[in-house]
A protein has these predicted regions:
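Sequence/fold signature of self-assembling virion shell proteins
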Residues: 2-52, 59, 63, 163-192, ...
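Extracellular structured ligand-interaction cores
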Residues: 97, 132, 215-217
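Beta-edge loop/turn motif
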Residues: 216-226
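Short, basic/hydrophobic alpha-helical segments
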Residues: 205-212, 216
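Alpha-helical scaffold segments that mediate packing/assembly in large oligomeric complexes
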Residues: 113-204, 332
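Assembly/oligomerization interface modules of large self-assembling protein complexes
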Residues: 32-112
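Hydrophobic side chains in beta-strands
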Residues: 100-102, 222, 308
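Short helix/loop capping segments that flank catalytic or ligand/cofactor-binding pockets
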Residues: 110, 144, 229-231
Length: 333
C-alpha cells in the first residue's frame, strides 16, 4: 500500500508529471527492450515453432547444396563427375513503421488505476515504461496474427501488408510448380477433414511424406480446429481403451512420437497443413538497424504520438521433400 510519503497522484498531478519529455526519456532509456518487445510477444506461441534470424540487413540468402554421391566396390579407376547444384532462398526484411496517436490521460488512468487496485504506487518512470510496453506488445500481437497470411503490399498501411507470410510464400510456390506432387513435397487431401476422419486423414498425409522427413523430429503446423477434430476423432475411437488416459495428444499417432502437433492460433483458416522442422520457417529482423526505434512526441495539444519502426520478413528455408511437406486441404463447401 502507498505510504504517507508516497501519496497517490491526482489526475492533475499525473498530467503535470507524466509529460512527453518523460515518455521520450523512458523510450530512450528502454529503447532496446521496446524494440524487442514485439519479438518477446511472439515467443509466447509462434517462436516456439519457427526460428528467429536476427541481424538481417536487407536480405540474406541461404544456399542449399543438392547433389548425389555414393560408395561402390573399391576400384582404383573410380572417378565420377559430381552431380550437384546450389539452390538459394532469400530472406528479405522490410522496414515498417507505426504512428499511433493516443489520449495520455485515458492511458495513464487505465494503467495507474490497475496499480491502485493492487495497492501499488508506481514511479512516474515505471508508468511511462508500462505505457510504451503496451503499445510495443500490440505491434508484436499483430505480427503474430499475420506471420502466415501476410501479403506484401507497398501501398498498404497494416502489418498484413508488410511482408509475405509463410502461407503466402507456400501458395506462390505451389502456383510456380516448386511445390507439387511430382516433386514429392505436396499432398492433396481427397476429402474435407471432420471429426470422423481426422485421424485417418492426418496419418495418410504423414505417410505420404518423404522417408527422410519421417525419420527426423518434425512439427505438423495446422489449424487449431483441425487439431480439435483429430482429438475428438481419436477419443471416439480409443476412449474406452485402458491405455488411453490422456485426451490431449501431442504427437501424431503412427509417427513413433516424431511428429509433434503445432496447432497455432494464427493458422486458423489456413488452406494447408505443413510438416517440417522449426529451423525451416525463418523470421528475419534486425533490432540494431538504424531504422528500428521507439519514440514519443507531442505534435498537438492533449494528444501524444507513439512512433515505432522496425524491419521484419519471412521465408521458408527449403522446399526440399526431405525437409518439407505440404498438405492441401479440400474445402467442405
Amino acid at each position: 500500500m502507498a505510504t504517507p510519503s508516497q501519496q497517490l497522484m491526482t489526475p492533475d498531478e499525473m498530467k503535470e508529471r507524466i509529460t512527453p519529455e518523460i515518455l521520450e526519456t523512458s523510450a530512450r532509456q528502454f529503447q532496446r527492450q521496446l524494440i524487442t518487445m514485439p519479438i518477446e510477444t511472439l515467443r509466447e506461441e509462434t517462436l516456439k515453432y519457427i526460428t528467429l534470424v536476427p541481424g538481417v540487413r536487407n536480405s540474406v540468402t541461404f544456399g542449399e547444396l543438392q547433389g548425389d554421391a555414393q560408395l561402390g566396390p573399391w576400384s582404383r579407376e573410380r572417378k565420377e563427375d559430381a552431380d550437384y547444384k546450389i539452390v538459394g532462398r532469400t530472406l528479405q526484411v522490410y522496414p515498417g513503421n507505426c504512428t499511433y496517436d493516443f489520449d495520455p490521460m485515458e492511458v495513464f488512468n487505465s494503467i495507474y488505476g490497475h496499480h491502485i487496485i493492487n495497492g501499488d504506487n508506481p514511479s512516474v518512470m515505471q508508468l511511462a515504461r508500462e505505457i510504451l510496453a503496451v503499445f510495443a506488445a500490440a505491434i508484436g500481437g499483430h505480427l503474430n496474427d499475420h506471420i502466415w497470411n501476410a501479403v506484401r503490399n507497398v501501398s498498404g498501411t497494416k502489418t498484413v501488408d508488410l511482408f509475405d507470410g509463410f502461407d503466402t510464400i507456400i501458395n506462390k510456390e505451389i502456383v510456380a510448380g516448386n511445390i507439387s506432387k511430382t516433386k514429392g513435397n505436396l499432398f492433396e487431401f481427397s476429402e474435407a477433414i471432420d471429426r470422423t476422419n481426422a485421424v485417418d486423414s492426418l496419418k495418410e498425409f504423414y505417410v505420404s511424406a518423404n522417408k527422410h522427413l519421417k525419420g527426423i523430429p518434425t512439427f505438423m503446423y495446422l489449424d487449431p480446429e483441425i487439431y480439435r477434430m483429430y482429438l475428438d476423432d481419436h477419443q471416439a475411437r480409443n476412449g474406452s481403451l485402458p491405455y488411453n488416459t490422456n485426451y490431449e495428444k501431442l504427437t501424431l499417432e503412427g509417427s513413433n512420437g516424431k511428429c509433434t502437433f503445432a496447432p497455432l492460433s494464427n493458422l486458423a483458416g489456413s488452406g494447408t497443413i505443413k510438416i517440417s522442422t522449426k529451423n525451416n520457417f525463418l523470421l528475419g529482423t534486425d533490432i540494431n538497424n538504424q531504422e528500428s526505434q521507439a519514440r514519443v512526441k507531442e505534435y498537438k495539444p492533449w494528444v501524444f504520438t507513439f512512433l515505432f519502426a522496425g524491419v521484419y520478413g519471412a521465408q521458408v528455408r527449403t522446399l526440399s521433400k526431405e525437409r518439407f511437406h505440404v498438405g492441401k486441404l479440400k474445402s467442405s463447401l
